[in-house]
């Protein structure tokens, strides 16, 4: 299972958007955070981060067009990255493990009307996690409980329940994302 949605915080600078994403990982896992403010979405290092990092922050995310947009959309949904590392004779198959998040000061960042991968939200302010520490024990206990619920529902094949976005969900998301579309 791969997270195919990018949670994006949009708001003015200095309100702890990136800081929040960094601190959402407890200190023992922060080595698995990467801030990619100048990411080249076709670069092998960027693709390798999907396997080696837990959270990839697309900081200062702006409008993405053309080849860059196609590469980003493809990378978000890939289950496996097949890359040849420098000096290796053969390709390595790297499982997609990382989730993406993003920040932007710009409101209009979406260029693709069909883009269901972006989940942008206006943020006025975020309490500094440096000054008000995150209660990791309770946050991650809730995450584990939700993960177990998803696993059980999938295993039990509960009728009418899915863990992916439905057509209705995608329509609602498109309507919401309309306010973040780049004007033509």
Predicted regions and their residues:
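Short glycine-/polar-rich loops that comprise or flank the Walker A/P-loop
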Residues: 52-54, 96-99, 113-119
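Conserved AAA+/SF3 P-loop NTPase catalytic/coupling segment centered on the Walker-B
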Residues: 54-76, 108-115
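C-terminal, non-catalytic macromolecule-binding modules
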Residues: 124-153
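Conserved catalytic/switch belt of AAA+ P-loop NTPases
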Residues: 69-93
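P-loop NTPase catalytic core of nucleic-acid-dependent motor ATPases
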Residues: 1-52
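DNA transaction DNA-binding modules
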Residues: 151-184
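AAA+/SF3 P-loop NTPase mechanochemical coupling elements
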Residues: 46-51, 85-103
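A short helix-turn-beta junction within AAA+ P-loop NTPase domains corresponding to the substrate/partner-engaging
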Residues: 110-128
């Amino acid at each position: 299972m791969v997270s195919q949605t990018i949670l994006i915080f949009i708001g003015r600078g200095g309100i702890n958007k990136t800081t929040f994403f960094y601190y959402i990982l407890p200190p023992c896992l922060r080595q698995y955070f990467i801030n990619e403010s100048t990411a080249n979405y076709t670069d092998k290092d960027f693709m390798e981060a999907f396997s080696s990092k837990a959270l990839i922050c697309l900081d200062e995310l702006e409008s993405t067009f053309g080849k860059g947009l196609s590469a980003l959309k493809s990378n978000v949904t890939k289950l496996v990255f097949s890359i040849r590392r420098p000096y290796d004779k053969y390709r390595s198959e790297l499982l997609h493990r990382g989730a993406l998040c993003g920040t932007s000061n710009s409101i209009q960042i979406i260029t693709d009307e069909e883009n269901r991968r972006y989940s942008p939200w206006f943020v006025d302010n975020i309490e500094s996690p440096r000054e008000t520490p995150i209660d990791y024990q309770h946050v991650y206990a809730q995450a584990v409980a939700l993960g177990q619920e998803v696993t059980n529902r999938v295993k039990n094949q509960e009728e009418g329940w899915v863990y992916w976005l439905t057509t209705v969900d995608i329509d609602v998301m498109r309507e919401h994302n309309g306010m973040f579309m780049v004007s033509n």
